Amino acid sequence: MTKLAPLITGFLRDYMPRQRGYSPQSCETYAFGFKLLFDFAATRLGTRPSRLMIEDLDAPMIIAFLGHIEQERGNGASTRNLRLASIKTFMRYVEHKVPSALEQIGRVHAIPSKRHDQKLIRHLTMEEVRAILN
């Protein structure tokens, strides 16, 4: 069993900002999403987030979390897909740190994004453009 805390710390404090060049705002957004995931997983497992192991974040747990943020938190499919993308990015990082978790990580990577309708961009009328420019 591999503790999750050192992995997420290395991911958020070193890998994302220093190696990948993510902005502080992006790192904060990722951190918030992981806080939601860890709180959800800890509640389901009856433990504290600080005691979670990487093995606890298997595909069924991730799928349950994605359902939770859609159904109970009221997030849409695009937010769900962003959370899933951040989890997959973290799992790519973990692949190099915990080779024994490769099968589990492969199952997480196999979770598909959810299709969703994209909103059409509304164009301004000439009258609206003139009002803005004047």
Show which residues each predicted segment covers.
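DNA breakage-rejoining catalytic core of tyrosine-based enzymes
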Residues: R115-L133
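Alpha-helix boundary recognition
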Residues: P17, L133-N134
